[in-house]
Amino acid sequence: MDKHKVKRQRLDRICDGIRPPILNGPMPVRPLVALLDGRDCTIEMPILKDVATVAFCDAQSTQEIHEKVLSEAVGALMYHTITLSREDLEKFKALRIIIKIGSGYDNIDIKSAAELGIAVCNIPSASVEETADSTLCHILNLYRRVTWLHQAMREGNRPASVEQIREVAGGAARIRGETLGIIGLGRIGQAVALRAKAFNFTVIFYDPYLADGVERSLGLQRMATLQELLMHSDCITLHCNLNEHNHHLINDFTIKQMRQGCFLVNTARGGLVDEKALAQALKDGRIRGAALDVHESEPFSFSQGPLKDAPNLICTPHTAWYSEHASIEAREEAAKEIRRAIAGPIPDSLRNCVNKDYLLAAVQWSGMEQAAVHPELNGASSYRFPPGVVGVTSAGHPSAIEGLVASSHPLIPSVSHTPSPGQTTKPDPDREIPTDQ
């Protein structure tokens, strides 16, 4: 028998054996797909309207999601502003597929999802150009101190002499000949490397999962260990997904391995950096300056936390990924992945299933019934409302978004809500970072 067919049948048994199949019948019986942490479904609706009912929840936690969605939704779209732990996932009774709009998925317990029969997908191509551009902006800002010079001008400090210029612009440095160290050479890491070379950086990288030879094709130098990269870099930029192996990758110990006066940039995941250790290093001058787009606790505030008094620090609110074009592109791809899931089978029909291996390991085959299962994803709970975009109100009634669905229910105005990027962790050309440092 074809080994690929056997493998697909095994995955079908996992998904269909743990949870019932999705019913995709004629109106009004259509599967329910819910946008968990947003309200704007105007991009997703044209792609899904003929196969599903699309609801929005605008929730920041599962406690804010109505029971109707928890009990009937078979598909979920989500950004980075909500977290799904095992406890959260267990509240969904019919869920079969989760799409993270963006590449990072550390806010989802993908192993527990697999054990519950839920496939998790991401959009690994989302916002690569935007994140790389933002990373270079942060790097240039640290070297040329644009933020601090602008702030001085706003405060009325207009230098009139060379001595005053030296005082205000102190710390500005020449880029040519500096060494940029990249941790994680996936899509975004490579895009950053190519941009940095144009600014005459010498670019080195550390990525234990990258195939040999990529460095030669890109004209980069590969470091064998993380310590070697830290010791040779004048500026370090992180492009790693967050997992149990690299949490607080930048900590007191690794900071002491860096060059004195090194710069640090993080546009990947906040948990990669121990902010307490970073704050102390900035105060001591061991790290000359840092630029963070992501933080351990978000939304970030300068008024609290270990970084509140740290000098030479630039912070932006997890927006390095954003452009209108990138947002639309990611949302379209997420909706198409949901559509593929409805057509089935799961997970073979999916392009970017990040917990496929966990799905395969979720069930002991010796104890499973060997009867054939339906190969298509035609099933889970049906939704009694007709296809369209609905918002589930506090009373549990569906409400249409104006201009999308004809309805006698009160209209809820749509508010734009956009996705978050990140990086993937699969050990293949599509993954964004080393999963084990």
Swiss-Prot record:
Active site, UniProt feature: R269, E298, H318 (proton donor)
Gene Ontology annotations of biological process type: negative regulation of DNA-templated transcription; regulation of transcription by RNA polymerase II; white fat cell differentiation; Wnt signaling pathway
Stretches for region Disordered: 410-437
Chief place where the protein resides: nucleus
Basic and acidic residues composition-biased segments: 427-437
Gene3D superfamilies xref list: NAD(P)-binding Rossmann-like Domain
GO cellular component entries: nucleus
Biological role stated in the UniProt entry: Corepressor targeting diverse transcription regulators.
Record's protein name: C-terminal-binding protein 2
Organism this protein belongs to: Xenopus laevis
Gene encoding the protein: ctbp2
